[in-house]
Swiss-Prot record:
<keyword id="KW-0808">Transferase</keyword>
<comment type="similarity">
    <text>Belongs to the trichothecene 3-O-acetyltransferase family.</text>
</comment>
<dbReference type="Pfam" id="PF22664">
    <property type="entry name" value="TRI-like_N"/>
</dbReference>
<feature type="region of interest" description="Disordered">
    <location>
        <begin position="211"/>
        <end position="231"/>
    </location>
</feature>
<comment type="pathway">
    <text>Secondary metabolite biosynthesis.</text>
</comment>
<dbReference type="GO" id="GO:0016746">
    <property type="term" value="F:acyltransferase activity"/>
</dbReference>
<dbReference type="InterPro" id="IPR051283">
    <property type="entry name" value="Sec_Metabolite_Acyltrans"/>
</dbReference>
<protein>
    <recommendedName>
        <fullName>O-acetyltransferase dmxR13</fullName>
        <ecNumber>2.3.1.-</ecNumber>
    </recommendedName>
</protein>
<comment type="function">
    <text>O-acetyltransferase; part of the gene cluster that mediates the biosynthesis of the dimeric xanthones cryptosporioptides. The pathway begins with the synthesis of atrochrysone thioester by the polyketide synthase dmx-nrPKS. The atrochrysone carboxyl ACP thioesterase dmxR1 then breaks the thioester bond and releases the atrochrysone carboxylic acid from dmx-nrPKS. Atrochrysone carboxylic acid is decarboxylated by the decarboxylase dmxR15, and oxidized by the anthrone oxygenase dmxR16 to yield emodin. Emodin is then reduced to emodin hydroquinone by the oxidoreductase dmxR7.</text>
</comment>
<dbReference type="InterPro" id="IPR023213">
    <property type="entry name" value="CAT-like_dom_sf"/>
</dbReference>
<keyword id="KW-0012">Acyltransferase</keyword>
<dbReference type="InterPro" id="IPR054710">
    <property type="entry name" value="Tri101-like_N"/>
</dbReference>
<feature type="compositionally biased region" description="Pro residues">
    <location>
        <begin position="219"/>
        <end position="231"/>
    </location>
</feature>
Amino acid sequence: MGSAIDFDLDGHLDILGQQPLLQMYTQICFAFPVADSSSYSAITKTLADGLERLSASFPWVAGHIVNEDSGEGNTGVFKIKPLDKSPSLIVKDFRNDPSFPTMEAIKKAGFPFSMLNEDIIAPRKTLPVRSDTPEISPVLVVQADLITGGLLLVFAGQHNAMDMTGQGQVIHLFSKACRNEPFTSDELVSGNLDRRTLVPLLDDSYKQGHELARQISQPRPPPSSDGPPPPKLDWTYILFSPTSLAELKSLAQKTITFPSSFISTDDTLSAFVWQAVARSRLPRFDASAKTTCARAVDVRSYLGVPSTYTGLLQNVTYDTFTLQKLVNEPLGSVASALRSGLDPKRPNDLGFSTRALVTVLSRTLDKNTFSFGGTVNPSLDFMVSSWAKLDSYELDFGLGLGKPEGVRRPQFQPLESLGFLMPKTQDGEIAFALCLMEEDMKRLRADEEFTKYGVFVG
């Protein structure tokens, strides 16, 4: 399989991974059909053996996250420490549980949130809960859910240690390990890079500027016991077929305003959903209220870091419109605005702003001061992250089951205004995960302009 690159686990997490608000797990579920029920024992053995091979070459994936030297006004240091020989593989068998849906039923329903609850199918909750937060925070945990006619394979990656791009690469490497394929020298190097010096700091002359203004954490008032109950929130998946995506992009290309004359499918779909969310909110807000799209971006290419780097290296772009302007703008104009935030030629581009954030974090004892969410107002703003480029639908993990038929993030605690583009299927479909207030979601479901292209599956 190739040998691991020698490195010291102690202090292995990079500076971006030192943010306490990243103490959470990112989950992704692969759904496979299983025709022969006698194959489950071979499946679990393949997975267990694959985790051992993965850990032999990338030992940090078998570690756990610890925090050291924290105290009053000091969030301490997050590190990866050795834990086990390999990440845990949890196996749960739901085949005799009549309340658990079959693979056929889940597929027929479109792999909805309602059938993929993290409390049941995932090895860790996304967000920490004081009453049940485990003392140990493994870097990676895998759960194999055996269901009638299928397998749900769920990965939970600790967010201080990896973003979704990094986690996607870890899963890609795990699939190779399950197939007993050797890792390339490039994979071994990029998967074991020393994270501490990966992003060069700005020199001592740098003074914090407006490029970080959006990432200063804003204290939120505690909920009042005398106030109204919090609004009910709803998660849903919306499916966009290859035809719908092509039509949306063609429509957007007619009104591009960014000089490069290029917008991506991600730009277009993110803009389309943001505009629709704004329309759903107009009845509740003044049309002059401002809304911001906070878009997570993989910044590896801006910093000369390999695309296969398995850690955390992301930042966020921010675009702001009034609600009225946003809903009235042509789709191409909004998509162009989102694209312009990725331009490496613009002043204070993502490379510089990421180095600035890393520099300031390195100088700051209390790293709760900064977060990617920063000034985001969930009631008005929109946070979106794209997993569309992950090769999830190409992975078979050597299980003899073929490629996955569905890849989804399991349902977790509702977070208003959060959206994800799921990995693109082999035929080009994208499932968009979205969480809104129930009343906004109801208006979105009735929005004919939106439902012309997107199909709700829940």
